[in-house]
Amino acid sequence: GVKQLSSIEDEYKGVRQGTGVADNRYSTHSQTTITPSSKIIVMSAAEVWFLRAEAALRYNTGDDVENCYKQGVTVSFAQWDANGVSDYLESDDRPAAYVDVFDAKFNADAPSTITPKWDNTADKEEKLERIITQKWLALYPEGCEAWAEQRRTGYPRLIKVAVKDRKS
């Protein structure tokens, strides 16, 4: 069963890396079980669309960058049976600051102001950030692939680790 370690019931809050979770107020991750018969995603349709968007942006391949970007988001939503893709693609919402529910010393400003809504007037770097940020989200649950994208491009911009002590 799920062990409730905090006073916040029926709600999950993310924990910033490096905050140290030794004090029972935070739940820890669960163990992953992968077997030879586990189904894994080698490359999703969303990843292909985002690769095409990036290639069109960088190398003028003839694909429409905005269309490829929107298709990537759309098929990612479809992959997970998520609703609201049209509203999401029109959203000007920016990433929120991280607010630790127990200790304000771990609070952090949002590292980016990128929105889901495509902006044709943006410069090439902002367009790349938008593409890769959505690609990173779409790569779930393939953490290694998402990590490689972040290392390759620097996107998405992530909140820095609070304490570098190998415990979190």
For the regions a language model picked out, list residue spans one by one.
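Acidic/polar-rich alpha-helix caps and helix-coil junctions
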Residues: 3-167
